[in-house]
Amino acid sequence: MISYGRQFIDKKDISAVVKVLKSKNLTQGPIVEKFENDLKKFMGSKYCCVLSSGTGALHLTGLTLGWNERDYVITTPISFLATSNAILYSGAKPIFVDIDKDTYNI
């Protein structure tokens, strides 16, 4: 398997997750709101909406862009399944194209 990334999770991260798991708010709640506000400030953005997955983020992107059954979206099959699924969830049709073997770009 080709390694493409690695997480850095320390004891502070684990403690924060355990704290949320023990709380009443497994989803939503004050920690999510704080994270969105902190991220918004960090990015210098007026708005921020975090999602539970990359699939959800890609789907929301398609909906925000107004993709529908009349749209075709170019993508590569050398990606996570979420990429093409989000296109389909938005009503558009994925068009698969080759990528450059050296850069992995379309």
Residue ranges: model-predicted function:
Residues 63-106:
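PLP-dependent aminotransferase-like
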